[in-house]
Amino acid sequence: MIKEYLKKPSLSDVQLTRDTRNIPIGKVGVKDISYPIVVMDKNKSFQNTIARINMYVDLPHHFKGTHMSRFVEILNEYREEIALDKLELILSTMKEKLGASNAHLEMEFPYFVEKTAPVSRAKSLMEYTCTFSASLSDRFDFVLGIKVPVTSLCPCSKELSSYGAHNQRSIMTVQVRYSEFIWIEDLIDIIEECGSSPVYSLLKREDEKFVTERAYENPRFVEDMVREATVRLLNMQNISWFSVEAENFESIHKHSAYAAIERSRES
């Protein structure tokens, strides 16, 4: 059966047929591929995790389509070594095998860090959502992103209320370009200091007392949080560009509060 199939005339390549609309496409490819990757871990050398991967290339105006299967073939080609130090090589392979000028690779994955409760010293794993965003045209570009949960306590509510202050869980999202390698754990530590208190996955009663009192003594607006992060990130000479966002999931309002700052070393 297979031999008979192979004897048939070759199948036409519709993707390579000419498109007459004369419109190039900036990004075309595949999204949301679940795939194992390896991430460098400050304490354990490396960490295996599962990423949701997007892969794109540009498409010249004269081609009807790209070859979608080649994206997955490239992932399988690097199946044992999908890691940060291989991203540029993977992008180069994408450009070569898909005849592209630009290639883009996006990965979102859970990353786990062992955290110690502040008083009981109980240890537990904390999950953080991280992203790798890489592209290759004439040069390689890479952006590391992390979503860091924190607690925020409202300074205005503390000032006005006789019985405490409203507080909530917040998400701070940081993205950085760097000239020298930065550990994910170090970036998490920096951002956690910008809220009213860090968030933990395991707290005993004595820890809860400590965390809530710390938050009360350290009230922060979203504006305070992104400004604190900006001060700390500007002091890191190996960061050439960053963006930082804070979103408070307000406990007494229907809306969320939001603030964002973007800076480059040149500016």
UniProtKB/Swiss-Prot annotation:
Looking at its record, which EC class is this enzyme? hydrolase
The protein's UniProt keywords, in alphabetical order, are: Hydrolase
Q: For the site May be catalytically important, which positions are given?
A: C154
Please provide, alphabetically and separated by semicolons, the GO molecular function terms listed in this UniProt record: GTP cyclohydrolase I activity
Membrane-spanning residues where?
Answer: none
Q: In which pathway does it act?
A: Cofactor biosynthesis; 7,8-dihydroneopterin triphosphate biosynthesis; 7,8-dihydroneopterin triphosphate from GTP: step 1/1
Disulfide pairings: none
Listed under GO biological process in this entry are:
tetrahydrofolate biosynthetic process
Q: Which Enzyme Commission number(s) are listed?
A: 3.5.4.16
Q: Which reaction does it catalyse?
A: GTP + H2O = 7,8-dihydroneopterin 3'-triphosphate + formate + H(+)
Its family remark reads: Belongs to the GTP cyclohydrolase IV family.
Q: State its role.
A: Converts GTP to 7,8-dihydroneopterin triphosphate.
Which named protein is this? GTP cyclohydrolase FolE2
What is the organism of origin for this protein?
Geobacter sp. (strain M21)
